[in-house]
Regions:
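Cell-envelope/extracellular polymer assembly enzymes that use nucleotide-activated donors
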Residues: 3-5, 32, 175
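Short beta-strand/loop segment that forms part of the nucleotide-sugar
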Residues: 7-8, 20-21, 30-39
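Short, well-formed alpha-helical segments that are part of the catalytic scaffolds
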Residues: 12-26
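Acidic helix N-cap motif at the loop->helix transition within catalytic regions
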Residues: 15-19, 41-51
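Conserved donor nucleotide-binding strand/loop of the catalytic core
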Residues: 32-34, 45-73
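Acceptor/aglycone-binding surface of glycosyltransferases and processive sugar-polymer synthases
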Residues: 59-73, 90-170, 196-217
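Short aromatic/hydrophobic "clamp" motif used to bind/position activated sugar donors
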Residues: 79
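Catalytic donor-sugar/metal-binding loop of nucleotide-sugar-dependent glycosyltransferases
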Residues: 143-144, 165-168, 177-195
Length: 227
């Protein structure tokens, strides 16, 4: 079992993956860094391996599918999940891990919305969507989660091994937040700085289609947990 596992799902992140891997290896020297490549065509996997990551593959497209394989295959005392786009600061990882190992948190949310997200993010409808999803999730499920859609979290072993990954795409962030709330797991928020993607790096999230899927996930889980 790893002491700390850093899990990085990637699809065509050749411009940033080397830096992300190197940054997390630097701030968490006791961690094993895993990059799960999701059919990249730009050399992401090779670059990640060259930077020192353990590279594995998921051939079913979609972030949820990648996370299902990650959570099934990797055993660790604490986990960091982070996107490979270099928008999240590795420097916050030790504090997030400490919340899991020291305070027994099951999920630690890297909260962008209380920091630099609204000034750094150049997609205004993403801002509105984040606010809407946060309001709906907290209001309907009784949470105090500051950032539902963040791609930066820490988890306990208990969370990872009891969470049934159902969603295939970007709805996964909302789904796992609701799972933690419904299971009365300990959730903490850690404020992090956020920076927009570097020039030439493109988001895989579609504001409208993925946004409707997220709202549909909230409705589906509300029906499941609160029939």
């Amino acid at each position: 079992m790893d002491k700390i596992a850093v899990l990085i799902p990637c699809y065509n992140e050749s411009k940033t993956v080397e830096k992300v891997v190197s940054d997390f290896r630097r701030v968490l020297p006791d961690a094993t860094v895993y990059v799960y490549d999701n059919n990249s065509t730009d050399g992401t996997a090779e670059l990640a391996a060259g930077a020192g990551a353990v590279v594995r593959h998921e051939y079913q497209q979609g972030k949820g599918n990648v996370m299902r394989r990650m959570f099934r295959e990797i055993d660790a005392e604490a986990y960091i999940l982070v996107d490979g786009d270099d928008t999240y600061p590795a420097e916050a990882a030790p504090e997030m891990v400490a919340a899991v190992t020291g305070r027994q948190a099951d999920m630690v949310v890297g909260d962008r919305l209380s920091s630099t997200y609204y000034t750094q993010n150049k997609r205004p409808f993403h801002n509105f969507g984040n606010d809407l999803v946060r309001f709906c999730t907290n209001h309907l499920f009784g949470g105090k989660i500051k950032d539902i859609m963040t791609g930066y979290r820490a988890f306990s072993y208990q969370f990872v091994k009891t969470y049934p990954v159902l969603s295939r795409g970007f709805e996964i962030e909302t789904e796992m937040t609701i799972h933690a709330l419904q299971r009365n797991m300990q959730v903490e928020n850690v404020v992090i700085d956020y920076r927009d993607r570097p020039e030439g790096s493109e988001s895989k999230l579609n504001t409208y289609s993925d946004g409707f899927k997220v709202l549909g996930t909230i409705a589906r889980l509300l029906k499941t947990y609160r029939p």
